[in-house]
Swiss-Prot record:
Residues 47-151 form the FAD-binding FR-type domain. Belongs to the flavoprotein pyridine nucleotide cytochrome reductase family. GO terms for biological process: cellular response to oxidative stress; ergosterol biosynthetic process. InterPro entries: CBR-like, Cbr1-like_FAD-bd_dom, FAD-bd_FR_type, Flavoprot_Pyr_Nucl_cyt_Rdtase, FNR_nucleotide-bd, OxRdtase_FAD/NAD-bd, Riboflavin_synthase-like_b-brl. This is NADH-cytochrome b5 reductase 2-A. It comes from Vanderwaltozyma polyspora (strain ATCC 22028 / DSM 70294 / BCRC 21397 / CBS 2163 / NBRC 10782 / NRRL Y-8283 / UCD 57-17) (Kluyveromyces polysporus). It is a single-pass membrane protein.
Length: 296
């Protein structure tokens, strides 16, 4: 046997030895890449809070700002999935924890930072705190909080019904669908606000609608329109939904997000973060079932 090995052509010996070596190196390389990808995720679902500094503050409207928070590394990514949220926390001077959930509007795969669009409520403990922060100040985060697990092409079409700051998870869903060339889901967004100045993410939404006119259709509703306003005024009516949303069907789905009065009018609010509760309101009156509606 050894004589046979000795007679192997020396010209091919490096290739005989090299094949398993390459396979072994390939395994370690791919394993290392996987570990690096995993370690680059900022939020991994553990119970630890992480403090992130503010790197930028952009004023969007009279009561809304976009806050950019910097990750520990420029190569870090969120670790979030589409339509998931994060918990934020600060400690009051008396030592009490104030914790609130927020959905980032930045891409879940964006490197280096995340963006929150936050509306200031005068009686809101968290929004008062965040609006008092300056660049380089920090805020504590934990997550992710998974919500709806989006699978491309799960439905032929979806209807998104949003009010005010409820646009954030809906925008994240719109952005994820439209950026995926293999996801052919049709999207209708009905978005309600008090005034034209209150419409959040309008620039981004309009750009997406212009870029994907065959896939995304947006209707804005203003309840107290300015003089000369030419869009839809008033609330998102039962009649409008009946005429413009898909009829209840396994091939379509409805997603709703907004403040409590808004939720109560259209779908009813959730019982808890993990319990959707029963379906009530306009969507139930139109024949939808709880299996066809998701409340963010």
């Amino acid at each position: 046997m050894f004589a046979r090995i000795a007679r192997i052509n020396p010209k091919i010996l490096p290739f005989v030895i090299g094949a398993p070596t390459i396979a072994l190196c390939s395994y370690y390389y791919s394993s290392g890449a996987f570990l690096r990808n995993e370690s680059s995720k900022v939020f991994i679902g553990d119970n630890n809070w992480i403090d992130l500094p503010i790197s930028r503050i952009e004023e969007i409207s009279h009561d809304t700002k976009r806050f950019t928070f910097k990750y520990p590394s420029q190569d870090s990514v969120s670790g979030l999935v589409v339509a998931s949220a994060l918990l934020t926390k600060f400690v009051t001077p008396k030592g009490s924890n104030v914790i609130r959930p927020y959905t980032p509007v930045s891409d879940v795969d964006e490197k280096g930072s995340l963006d929150l669009v936050i509306k200031h409520y005068p009686d809101g403990k968290m929004t008062n705190h965040i609006f008092s922060l300056k660049v380089n100040d920090t805020l504590s985060f934990k997550g992710p909080i998974p919500k709806w697990k989006w699978v491309p092409n799960s439905f032929e079409s979806i209807t998104l019904i949003g009010g005010g700051t409820g646009i954030t998870p809906l925008y994240q869903l719109i952005h994820a669908i439209t950026k995926n060339p293999n996801d052919k889901t049709k999207i209708r967004l009905f978005y309600s606000n008090k005034t034209s100045q209150d419409v959040l993410m309008k620039k981004e939404l309009d750009e997406l609608q212009a870029k994907y006119p065959d896939q995304l259709r947006i209707t804005y509703f203003i309840t107290t329109p300015d003089k000369g306003y030419k869009g839809e005024s008033g609330f998102i009516s039962k009649e409008f939904i009946a005429s413009n949303a898909d009829k209840p069907s396994p091939k379509s789905h409805v997603f709703v997000c907004g403040p409590p009065p808004f939720m109560n009018a259209y779908s009813g609010d959730k019982k808890s973060p993990t319990d959707q509760g029963e379906l009530v309101g306009i969507l139930k009156e139109l024949g939808y079932t709880i299996d066809q509606v998701y409340k963010f």
